[in-house]
């Protein structure tokens, strides 16, 4: 039973790390990466759909993305959606859409660093909340006399070690992202 709680907490913490990576993908580093446009929604026959469902997004060079719509009629809508996104990008439209990424200024780098730190802090909070939930479940098992106090103490220590491991991983990934951001 305790092992199930440990496995469950590890899986939930792993999902938090995956979510952190998705959050980091939205932070521009100055290099072109298709995931920068993941959050862009395009109007398509009356409903908004993710850009990657109406076009291929690729990297042309280190500072340019290329968006190739599946239908030529979508070029204007995709162009407009990219311009209106909060990414600060100005696409160049022809048969396909080229999206040059502006060079990051020092101020922009600092802003992106703040966003990355915020994402990391949110991940740490989520991990700690998972720990709190699992420790609550363990205490409930103790109250129901399903486990002994020694088992509760050991399980609590194990959960803390798992939590520390994942918090350290978040810090490691944040440090890597910050280093990537500050690289000119």
Swiss-Prot record:
Keywords: Cytoplasm, Protein biosynthesis. InterPro entries: Ribosome_recyc_fac, Ribosome_recyc_fac_dom, RRF_sf. Gene3D superfamilies: 3.30.1360.40, Ribosome-recycling factor. It is found in: Cytoplasm. GO terms for cellular component: cytosol. It holds the Pfam family RRF. GO terms for biological process: cytoplasmic translational termination. GO terms for molecular function: ribosomal large subunit binding. Responsible for the release of ribosomes from messenger RNA at the termination of protein biosynthesis. May increase the efficiency of translation by recycling ribosomes from one round of translation to another. HAMAP family: RRF. Belongs to the RRF family. This is Ribosome-recycling factor.
């Amino acid at each position: 039973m305790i092992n199930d709680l440990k496995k469950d907490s590890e899986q939930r913490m792993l999902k938090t790390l995956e979510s952190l990576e998705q959050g980091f993908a939205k932070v521009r580093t100055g290099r072109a990466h298709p995931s920068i446009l993941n959050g862009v929604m395009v109007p398509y026959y009356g409903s908004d759909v993710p850009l990657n469902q109406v076009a291929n997004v690729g990297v042309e060079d280190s500072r340019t993305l290329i968006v190739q719509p599946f239908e030529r009629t979508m070029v204007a809508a995709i162009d407009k959606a990219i311009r209106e996104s909060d990414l600060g990008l100005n696409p160049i439209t022809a048969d396909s859409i080229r999206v040059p990424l502006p060079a990051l200024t020092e101020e922009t780098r600092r802003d992106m660093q703040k966003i990355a730190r915020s994402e990391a802090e949110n991940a740490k909070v989520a991990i700690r909340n998972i720990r709190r939930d699992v420790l609550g479940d363990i205490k409930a098992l103790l109250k129901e006399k399903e486990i002994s106090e020694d088992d509760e103490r050991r399980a609590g220590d194990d959960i803390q070690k798992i939590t520390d491991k994942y918090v350290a991983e978040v810090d490691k990934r944040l440090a890597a992202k910050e280093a990537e951001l500050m690289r000119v």
